[in-house]
Each structure stands twice: as structure tokens, then as C-alpha cells.
Amino acid sequence: SGHKNIVAVKDSARDADRIQTLARRYAGTNFPVLAGCSGLFGHALRWGARGLVPGTANFAPEPHVKMWKAATAGDWEAVDDLQKQISKLNEQYQDGRPLGRSLPLLKAIMAEKGLCGPDVLPPLRRATGPS
């Protein structure tokens, strides 16, 4: 980055070209690119991203850990299979919704699993009823 306080970049845009450009640009450098868009995790790892910041891992960490291990082992077929699983998990709360609607649903899923309470901070509102 060139700035001592910026040590990595997390890209959560749903833009394959953007994460590909970032991951390839910084591959092999000491400036990690982290993928934040779950639908692009598998691709981002192929392109050189060095980590994931997955919302779905808050309630289902296992497929993300398996994906990371598969990617570091070069098992891209397993990565593709895991990407499908992760995308289905992601649909439970995101499914094209804006962040202001998907975050309360994520919290509700986590609350159902006993991981946290369902409350969110303003200006967001707690999820109610079917999504």
C-alpha cells in the first residue's frame, strides 16, 4: 500500500474483474488481498487472494476452512464443490439483498444457533418474520 498503517485490502464488491485485478496485482507481495464476497471466494483464491472474510463463517465455519485447505493444496475441484455449498449458505441471508437487510438476517441466523443475540445497531433494524 505504501502506507505503514494499511496492511491489507478486503474487497467485498460483487465484481469479479475488480477482485481479480487486485489479487493478481498484489500476488506474491507483502500486501494481502482478502475476499469478502462469498460468491467469488473460490475464484479469488485461484487469482491469488490470501484470505477470506466470510459472513457465512459466523454460523458455518467448516466449509470455509475446508475451502482454504483445498486451495492451499491446489485442489481446485474441491474448491469448486465447496464454493457451491458456501453460495447456498450465503443465499439464506444475502440473496441479492442490500447490506442493510442482509446483516439483520445474518444476526437472526446466528441467534437461532445460539451464537449471539438478534439485535443490530441503528440505523439497522432487527429482522422480523420471514425474509
Feature locations, PLM:
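Catalytic alpha/beta core domains of metabolic enzymes, predominantly
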Residues: 1-90, 94
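Short, flexible active-site recognition loops that position polar ligands and cofactors
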Residues: 120-130
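Generic structural signal for well-ordered, non-membrane alpha-helical segments
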Residues: 60, 79, 83, 99-103, ...
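Conserved short secondary-structure transition element at the edge of the structured enzyme core
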Residues: 41, 45-49, 88-122
